[in-house]
Amino acid sequence: MDAANLVMKSSMFSKSPCPVFGSKLIPRAPPSVFTLPSTFRPLVKCIQASFPQNPDSKIPSNNSTFTCSAVTSFPSQQSQPHATSDAKLQLLISEFQSLVEPMDRVKRLLHYSTLIPSMDASLKTPENRVLGCTTQVWLHVSFDEAENRMKFVADSDSDITKGFCACLVSLLDGATPDEVLALKTEDLNALNVAGLNGKGSASRANTWHNVLVSMQKRTRALVAEREGRPRNELFPSLVITADGIQPQGSYAEAQARFLFPDESRVQELASLLKEKKIGVVAHFYMDPEVQGVLTAAQKLWPHIHISDSLVMADKAVSMAKAGCEYISVLGVDFMSENVRAILDLAGFPEVGVYRMSDERIGCSLADAAASPAYLDYLKTASTSSPSLHVVYINTSLETKAYSHELVPTITCTSSNVVQTILQAFAEVPDLEVLYGPDTYMGSNIAELFTQMSTMTDEEISEIHPLHNRSSIKSLLPRLHYFQDGTCIVHHLFGHEVVENINEMYGDAFLTAHFEVPGEMFSLAMEAKKRGMGVVGSTSNILDFIKERVEEALNRNVDEHLQFVLGTESGMITAIVAAVGKLLGSADTSSGGAKVSVEIVFPVSSESVTRTSTGSSLDQNKVNIIPGVASGEGCSLHGGCASCPYMKMNSLSSLLRVCQSLPHGKAELSAYEAGRFSLQTPNGKQIADVGCEPVLHMRHFQATKRLPEQLINQILQRSSSA
């Protein structure tokens, strides 16, 4: 039947007109067929409605019904040659906001899904899939050279999602590239079309944003091609499937070579550890060769652990209790210092603790906190009362000890820093919180709280039950953070990298550590709002990736997931292991869906070797840093997404230490983590005072409340001030 003569029966009926598609209601008796001008693509609906008697009405009811047809037209580009995308958007917003009932909006969306034809099967390819939608969505984009306008074709296996696509196509099909790129995802916030409070409504709303982002990414690519401009180069990446991994780019290839280590080296290390009763605690951020060997050796010797810095000392104590006589620490110096101090406090002073280099293994963040500027920051702020110092766990015991004597101090990790600060504000009235040393994390926390101040009380209570919009607004001027502390790794995620992500990976899943610079943080926060990102710790990032993979497997359709890894690349081993396990457990042998996962490393054009001329390195006489710039701006033992300090923990150093024990202790004196003999200004042992902020944090993690001892310290210091 010709579209202009189509008659459809439906229960959908609205008293308001359809401004975008030109709806009008035509009352009539029996159904009939209308013929419209060729410039319209109409949809005629027959509606039969029965009106129940209003008990308050004085008009008697005759239980009558009436029937009418709604003619909804979809103007062609010729009929509205000057209509801008913005004007169309305002009409669309007005239309949906005029529908009070949520179900009416859903029905209108279903109605729009009938206005666009199904996409040709040849275009429903994996390359045309839109990520982040709970259903399958395809998008094909082309450029009309003659008219200098964009053309969009979209489809979905869900009628509701297809309705979303129809609305976006109606806005942007035939628009200029500038119009397409000017539309912002927040411009679509007023289009709460689904309007359902049930499970999945948020993911439906995210469809607007994810399809728009894909439209814009592909528009940029076509415009660049048309203008003859070279596009930004793709970042190196690693593709994980049930059959294995496929490296992309020289950097990812280098990483992959060590994900499956030499079995002879694995056997050699495991035998040494077992023979000499050596435990190993290692941080995520280290050389991939070492991670690969250690991960494989865990199957042969259980006393090997790879984690964030917080857990390393705890695991060392467990290993000592299990009979280990030595602990090798693969990390920076403050981590080995923490292990040494915690073992002493736990009653294991005889257990030796060894670093992996006879040179200093520094940390730019820890160095910043040990600077005179940081102590001056605390001294100035400590005049405010009451005050609490929240210090990042990745600092030395000296920093924790000296800080704690100036201002009551609690340590934090990127996983618990937000909850720690919010709980402190909730428990201590008029509290001033001083965070340090990482400037990026501090600014990101402040930005997060600023965003929270615009949320509803219900949304805020989901983050922390003791806060609301009023309390969040009141704490903002009482939150302070150090201005001169930078992690050299996360500093590299700057404007250039963010620009490349926007152009090349805007429709991918984005992950960001709390410490990354504000631009990368904001980008990930925006993606998080539409279900496409996560901001948090390394563990949060890993959990997010695993959840998205599980969802894809449950959908049981062929799918390619792409994640931008906005943190140090050393955690790729943990990601490969977790994702590989999930994909391997899926049954694809009987024709099941095939899911692949791509991990993208956003590598800056700046190399970390630039920091060799920086003050933090020169002051500490670190003359040789593994990993000079090469290839794509990074190399196996360093580079823009790898910490040069962590890469000093080489496999050869680990084997050398293990081989020298126990008889070569004298040769390893420079490797041994020494005990603190210095005292604080108040005459106390650094290890005793420095461990107290860590114990405060452990109490908070166990109880979700600040320890009473810490609160008393805050109030007593306030009274004395």
Curated annotation (Swiss-Prot):
GO biological process, one term: nicotine biosynthetic process
Organism encoding this protein: Nicotiana tabacum (Common tobacco)
GO MF term (any one): 4 iron, 4 sulfur cluster binding
UniProt binding sites for iminosuccinate: H283, S309, Y392, I393, N394, S414, H513, F514, E515, T538
Family as reported in the entry's similarity comment: Belongs to the quinolinate synthase family. Type 1 subfamily.
Residues given in the record as [4Fe-4S] cluster binding sites: C363, C487, C643
SUPFAM superfamilies to which the protein is assigned, alphabetical: NadA-like, SufE/NifU
Superkingdom of the source species: Eukaryota
Protein's name according to its UniProt entry: Quinolinate synthase, chloroplastic
Pathway: Alkaloid biosynthesis; nicotine biosynthesis; Cofactor biosynthesis; NAD(+) biosynthesis; quinolinate from iminoaspartate: step 1/1
Annotated compartments: Plastid, Chloroplast
GO annotations of cellular component type: chloroplast
Co-factor binding comment: Binds 1 [4Fe-4S] cluster per subunit.
Catalytic activity: iminosuccinate + dihydroxyacetone phosphate = quinolinate + phosphate + 2 H2O + H(+)
Leading EC class: transferase
Transit peptide feature range: 1-67
UniProt entry keywords in alphabetical sequence: 4Fe-4S, Alkaloid metabolism, Chloroplast, Iron, Iron-sulfur, Metal-binding, Plastid, Pyridine nucleotide biosynthesis, Transferase, Transit peptide
Its EC number(s): 2.5.1.72
